[in-house]
UniProtKB/Swiss-Prot annotation:
It comes from Homo sapiens (Human). It comes from the Eukaryota. Pfam families: TRASH_ZMYM4, zf-FCS. Keywords: Metal-binding, Nucleus, Phosphoprotein, Repeat, Zinc, Zinc-finger. GO terms for biological process: cytoskeleton organization; regulation of cell morphogenesis. This is Zinc finger MYM-type protein 6. A zinc finger (MYM-type) spans 113-151, 163-206, 213-248, 296-334, 342-443, 451-485, 492-531, 538-572. Residues 695-706 have a biased composition (Polar residues). It is found in: Nucleus. Plays a role in the regulation of cell morphology and cytoskeletal organization. One of its GO terms (cellular component) is nucleus. Its main location: nucleus.
């Protein structure tokens, strides 16, 4: 065996020459590219999943009314079939390295195996007598690898044995599974942090190398991430981060187009939204494998389709149209249900394909070719269609549709082919690997130079190799920068995705809802400029970004590469500025030209640019993009009526910013299409029909529906039936008189007139510089202007031009000063509202704004921004009275929002409580619980806070509440629940609040005695001997805490003895939880307190000498600690009757279990008492009897306070378990049938596992309104008065109790709604 000579090299590689010829980085022509995009499944099994176009304008009006597209939301993890590979790779049979095209290959005589060198042939040659190698199993899919050449052996870190894989996709999938899984906790779970080794609540949980690491904070998470060099998985299209939810999730893999379609139909989960890059559960991520074997993740089906469409569009090569088979650059794309992409050259081909695709078997679709590029398609249900020109009815087969579309697009295809042949693909050179590439480059701007890379990996490697480091904005460490993000006008570098995500989250929490992302430059900023474009509200950081985005939106911008105007589909950030381009060709040409200019000396740059301008070829975009001049609306025109208008156009909504640009556009192409018979007619201003119509676009997560609007055509061709068509669509309108306006001349200033600043350029209006009067556009004539000067300002008739110029400058200065003053005033008022809102939310006195915030704000701005900024801060109105007025207005706005939401909710529940603990003022608080359909959940808000007289009855309380309910136009019949603390004035049988509300609510409201108050009443039931121990403990505590000297001396004594605690809590009867804490601390410090009381010669020291007394104290500390845990579990927001009843039942069963253990002398459930009894000679006979009697009485009192007959769960368990079979349901026969249907709904069953019970029933309203209403009437009522108690605690914390008690400031302190400050500021103007 020897190495072949140069002449024999061709013979050596003959067996696989065909394979080597196919190794290419990208397709060379349209035929190869079209072969790549051919789907593997039959069209009969596919569904169109999404429509997109280069022009990003909807073609819904062109599609069949009976044909609708639908997108499913992201759901479980899905493995979709990827786009077929573009090239076939050949590997060395020995070392498994890939053989590149043109590389010398070696093989044995009589064998087809290829090797990269003679060493590989020698090393891997084996005698025939050796036994066959053992079979290997793929580590990922566990399948046997039959062909040894397919084995890929890889050794991972921290793993000694190597692992085998059957393909590159299995290797990529295995590496993806080994990546760390991040779980974000929303509930506090106390564990030991893996980084700081502190016991704290777990914020993140990372499963890495089969070990679960708990992390307590963002700092520990970032440190763990950088220490282990981890990366977070994210969507390839939108960049949403992947994390695992805290609950159980189930992964599902789909391998066929049928499974994909079923998955999309059953998945109905709405993805969450967050600032910047959002978070997506890993169960919702879709896993695919590209042609190179790399595993890619997507957060939804929409992102997968959009990513593939973007890949096809950015390639810039010609593709065979799926309808007419013409090779052209694709202008429209259809995302099918199996993940494949169909490309089309025009909208006519899309309509033709849709008609053939959606036509049922055995039905002939009707289509009549009207003119070039136009086909009218009837709905599938219709049997025939009438031609627009008034001809006979004709039926056209799918083949004829394709034929007519191909014939109409033949001239366009020839032009596009000629232009495409002259286009040569420019390839760039990667700065790291020195490979040539023709894809969108990865850019790096460093030290005043631009660096181009073929991908993200090369960019990262270049940064590491050349130490491109900077200080990370989040972790404040000098590291290699991964990405730079712009926040509020400042570029912030980040060393990792985690730091960027945490910084964005902190930025969003700091600014709240005032923080928005600019639609143009993608920077996050609290500044907000809004503009509505074709019904969609866009937000921008400044006016400049809004104007640039508007020009891009209406396709009026020019390409930065070829300088042609039109749709710009590509953009890059070059030297800090955003550049826009037609397609990938222009991007590559621009980057190549800029790099060449940077390499040349300065005196040669202009020459190079001049040559480029001369030799630059026309862009393929302008020549190949058809101007759609006729689009038919298929929604409102009946099939049997003849419209007679063959050039009807759907008029798109164009804003004022683009109207001027549209009118000034050239219309030479349309003028050339006029018949010769009409050439004698005078030229008229034509409208750009390419802007008026709306081509196909991809709408995310919505179906592509036919446009239902049909309006009169904008055309200059006389139509025979134009009058009839106008009468059919809209009533006749009056003819408008054509106005001939004269343009402004500078000579008009001699008579004292200038152009009014607010007038339109198409019809300017003159304004007098003396009196400021504005005349109409028709008066823009010298005679009329001179007449105004002679009649009204005759004394100034002979003044020179300089006089009127001076008056003009004075008027301009006045207008600019007034505008600037109004702008500043608006910003100052907004700042005043923001400070007032934060003052009330922080429960601070109103005077703090003027006394503390304003002086420091002036000093800071003067020091940082200059004295002018400090002077501006002084003008912010922040007086005590102003802040109070601002708070009243903010509270009124929140109250208006609340009442509106309650009216939309229909059903609501109330929580009422009164208190007189604060400044001897009796306050009545009322909270309301309602359904917020905006966020699809239940909300709780403060309804009102009213000051009451000291002595008031239940009837008077009802009058106050009823007066407020009537003033807000709320209906008592919609009240489904009322919760109180059980006071006599609230629950009176005849004259109490309960009786009055039952009277007006027609017995529809369910009344609930607060669970926490009932639990407190149960805890107060003690035997006389135990109650005596409690009183004596309080006496000891009062002796120590009543004297400051005694407290200090006890603290010193505890510190000297090394005690864990050095002080005692203060006991109060009104504080329920303080009783358990006081007894526990008293027992823990019993030795220190005994020594202290003995030194003080107090008689109270004798109690600690009695072991039986100490044993009873230990038992009381244990039992009250357990009761405190139950009390805390009953507190919180959004609690339901079902949750609290379950917790009460659990405690009842624990009491029975403790009684059984007490009889067996087992006291492990009482740790303090068990420890003391084991370490002392305590006589257990008497104390066991006391404990048993107390537990038995406690169990009885719980049963009396929570009787089974008042348990609303009986017959209503279907609400919290709708997918389980229940014997007794309080439902009608119709509701039982609906519940059976709901239990079989797989979509709702998947939703039930991921949302709360209330959210589930709110989402089920559309499909099951009866069950929704029945369930919400049991879920809305309050079970506790916790919110009222929390509001009273907020009043206690405030320094301005008398002001907070008035209501507005208290509402801002406890509300979760955001006031509409922009609306309030506009009302001030």
């Amino acid at each position: 065996m020897k190495e072949p000579l140069d002449g024999e090299c061709g013979k050596a590689v003959v067996p696989q020459q065909e394979l080597l010829d196919k190794i290419k980085e990208e397709p060379d022509n349209a035929q190869e590219y079209g072969c790549v995009q051919q789907p593997k499944t039959q069209e009969s099994k596919l569904k169109i999943g999404g429509v997109s176009s280069v022009n990003e304008r909807p073609i819904a009006q062109q599609l069949n009314p009976g044909f609708q597209l639908s997108f499913a939301s992201s759901g479980p993890s899905v493995l979709l079939p990827s786009v077929p590979a573009v090239a076939i790779k050949v590997f060395c049979s020995g070392c498994k390295k890939m053989l590149y095209k043109g590389q010398t290959a070696y093989h044995k005589t009589g064998s087809t195996q290829l090797f990269c060198s003679t060493r590989c042939i020698t090393r891997h040659s084996s005698p025939a007598c050796l036994p066959p190698p053992p079979k290997k199993t793929c580590t990922n899919c566990s399948k046997d690898i039959l062909n040894p050449k397919d084995v890929i052996t890889t050794r991972f870190e921290n793993s000694y044995p190597s692992k085998d894989f059957c393909s590159q996709s299995c290797l990529s999938s295995y590496e993806l599974k080994k990546k760390p899984v991040v779980t974000i906790y929303t509930k506090s779970i106390s564990t030991k942090c893996s980084m700081c080794q502190k016991n704290a609540d777990t914020r993140f949980e990372v499963k890495y190398q089969n070990v679960v690491h708990g992390l307590c904070s963002d700092a520990c998470f970032s440190k763990f991430h950088s220490t282990n060099n981890l990366t977070m998985n994210c969507c390839e299209n939108c960049g949403s981060y992947c994390y695992s939810s805290s609950g159980p999730c189930q992964s599902q893999k789909v391998f066929s187009s049928t499974s994909v379609t079923a998955y999309k139909q059953n998945s109905a989960q709405i993805p969450p939204y967050a600032l910047g890059k959002s978070l997506r559960p890993s169960a919702e991520m879709i896993e695919t494998t590209n042609d190179s074997g790399k595993t890619e993740l997507f957060c939804s089906i929409n992102c997968l389709s959009a990513y593939r469409v973007k890949t096809v569009t950015s390639s810039g090569v010609q593709v065979s149209c799926h309808s007419c088979k013409t090779s052209a650059i694709p202008q429209y794309h259809l995302a099918m249900s199996n993940g494949t992409i169909y490309s089309f050259c025009s909208s006519s081909c899309v309509v033709a394909f849709q008609n053939v695709f959606s036509k049922p078997k055995g039905t002939n679709s009707s289509a009549v070719p009207l003119s070039q590029g136009q086909v009218v398609v009837s709905p599938p249900s219709s049997r025939s269609a009438v031609s627009i020109g008034g001809g006979n009815t004709s039926a056209v087969s799918p083949s004829s549709i394709r034929g007519s579309a191909a014939a109409s697009l033949q001239p366009l295809a020839e032009q596009s082919q000629q232009v495409a042949l002259t286009h040569t693909v420019v390839k760039l050179k990667c700065q790291h690997c020195n490979h040539l590439f023709a894809t969108k480059p990865e850019l790096l701007f460093y030290k005043g130079k631009m660096f181009l890379f073929c991908g993200k990996n090369c960019s990262d490697e270049y940064k590491k190799k050349n130490k491109v480091v900077a200080m990370c904005d989040y972790c404040k460490l000098q590291k290699i920068i991964k990405e730079t993000v712009r926040f509020s006008g400042v570029d912030k570098p980040f060393c990792s995705e985690v730091c960027k995500f945490l910084s964005a989250r902190d930025f969003g929490e700091r600014w709240g809802n005032y923080c928005k992302m600019c639609s143009y430059c993608s920077q996050t900023s609290p500044n907000l400029v809004e503009n509505r474009l074709e019904g969609k509200l866009e937000e921008f950081c400044c006016e400049d970004c809004m104007s640039k985005f508007t020009v891009l939106f209406y396709q009026m911008a020019k390409c930065d590469g070829c300088k042609r105007q039109g749709k710009l589909s590509e953009s890059i950030k070059w030297r800090g500025n955003i550049k826009h381009f037609c397609n990938l060709f222009c991007v590559l040409e621009f980057c190549h030209q800029q790099i060449m200019n940077d390499c040349l000396p300065q005196n040669k740059v202009n020459i190079s640019k001049a040559k480029t301008a001369v030799t630059e070829l026309p862009s393929a975009r302008t020549d190949t993009t058809p101007v759609i001049t006729s689009v038919m609306s298929l929604a409102k025109i009946p099939a049997t009526l003849s419209t007679g208008n063959t050039n009807s156009v759907l008029k798109g909504a164009v804003t004022k910013e683009a109207a001027k640009i549209i009118q000034d556009e050239s219309t030479q192409e349309d003028a050339m299409k006029f018949p010769s018979s009409q050439s004698s007619q005078p030229s008229r201003l034509l409208k750009n029909k390419g802007i008026s119509c709306k081509p196909v676009t991809q709408t995310k997560a919505t179906s592509c529906k036919p446009h239902t609007q049909h309006k009169e055509c904008q055309t200059d061709l006389p139509m025979p039936n134009e009058k009839n068509d106008a009468e059919l669509d809209s009533p006749p309108s009056k003819k408008k008189r054509l106005g001939f306006f004269q343009t402004y001349d500078t000579e008009y200033l001699k008579v004292g007139f200038i152009i009014c600043p607010g007038s339109k350029e198409s019809s300017p209006r003159p304004q007098c510089v003396i009196c400021g009067e504005i005349l109409s556009s028709e008066n823009m004539k010298p005679a009329n202007l001179s007449h105004h000067l002679k009649t009204k300002h005759s004394e100034l008739e002979n003044k020179p031009v300089d006089f009127f110029e001076q008056k003009s400058l004075e008027m301009e200065c006045q207008n600019s000063s007034l505008k600037k003053c109004l702008l500043v005033e608006k910003s100052l008022v907004k700042a005043s509202y923001l400070i007032a809102f934060q003052t009330a939310a922080s429960k601070k006195p109103f005077s703090i704004a003027e006394e503390l915030i304003k002086p420091y704000l002036v000093e800071m701005c003067s020091e940082v921004l200059g004295s002018s900024a400090g002077d501006k801060m002084k003008t912010i109105p922040l007086s005590n009275v102003t802040i109070q007025h601002r708070i009243d207005e903010l509270s009124a706005d929140i109250e208006d929002q609340l009442i509106q939401k309650v009216r939309e909710s229909k059903w609501f529940a109330l929580q009422i409580d009164e208190s007189s603990e604060i400044s001897n003022i009796t306050l009545l608080l009322c909270y309301i619980r309602f359904i917020d359909y905006d966020c699809r959940d239940v909300k709780e808000e403060l309804l009102f806070c009213i000051e009451m007289p000291t002595q008031i009855t239940g009837f008077e309380i009802f009058e106050l509440i009823n007066k407020y309910i009537d003033s807000k136009s709320l209906n008592w019949k919609h009240c489904v629940g009322l919760c109180t603390d059980g006071a006599a004035s609230m629950t009176g049988r005849y004259s109490g609040l309960k009786a009055k509300i039952q009277e007006v609510a027609m017995n529809t409201a369910a009344f609930t005695h607060c669970f926490i108050h009932r639990e407190r009443l149960v805890a107060e039931k003690l035997s006389p001997c135990l109650h005596k121990i409690l009183l004596q403990s309080a006496q000891i505590l009062s002796f120590i805490k009543s004297n400051a000297l005694n407290s200090r001396m006890l603290t010193i004594l505890c510190e000297e003895m090394g005690s864990e605690h050095v002080s005692l809590p203060l006991h109060a009867e009104v504080r329920w939880i303080s009783r358990g804490r006081m007894l526990k601390r008293l027992f823990e410090l019993r030795h220190e307190i005994e020594i202290f009381l003995s030194q003080k010669h107090s008689d109270l020291a004798k109690y600690f000498h009695d072991e039986e007394w100490v044993g009873k104290l230990a038992y009381l500390s244990d039992i009250f600690s357990l009761i405190n845990e139950l009390n805390l579990s009953l507190q919180g927001t959004l609690t339901t009757f079902f949750n609290l009843c379950n917790k009460i039942d659990v405690f009842k069963r624990k009491l029975k279990m403790w009684l059984k253990r007490t009889q067996e002398n087992d006291y492990d459930m009482f740790p303090s008492f068990s420890e003391f009894s084991n370490s002392s000679g305590l006589n257990m006979t008497d104390i066991t009897r006391i404990i048993f009697e107390h537990l038995e009485g406690l169990s009885q009192v719980f049963s009396d306070c929570f009787p089974p007959e008042q348990d609303l769960r009986s017959g209503n368990l279907w609400i919290i378990h709708p997918f389980m079979n229940h014997q007794n349901n309080n439902l009608t026969d119709f509701e039982e049938e609906k519940l059976t249907e709901l239990s079989s709904d797989l979509g709702l069953q998947a939703l039930f596992k991921s949302v709360s019970v209330t959210q589930f029933w709110i989402n089920a309203k559309t499909s099951y309104p009866e069950l929704h209403e029945r369930a919400m009437k049991f879920l809305l009522p309050f079970s506790t008065v916790y919110l009222c108690d929390a509001a009273f605690s907020a009043l206690t914390e405030s320094k301005q109790k008398n002001l907070l008690g008035s209501g507005p400031a208290l509402r801002l302190a406890v509300t979760s709604l955001i006031p509409r400050i922009e609306k309030l500021v506009k009302e001030k103007e």
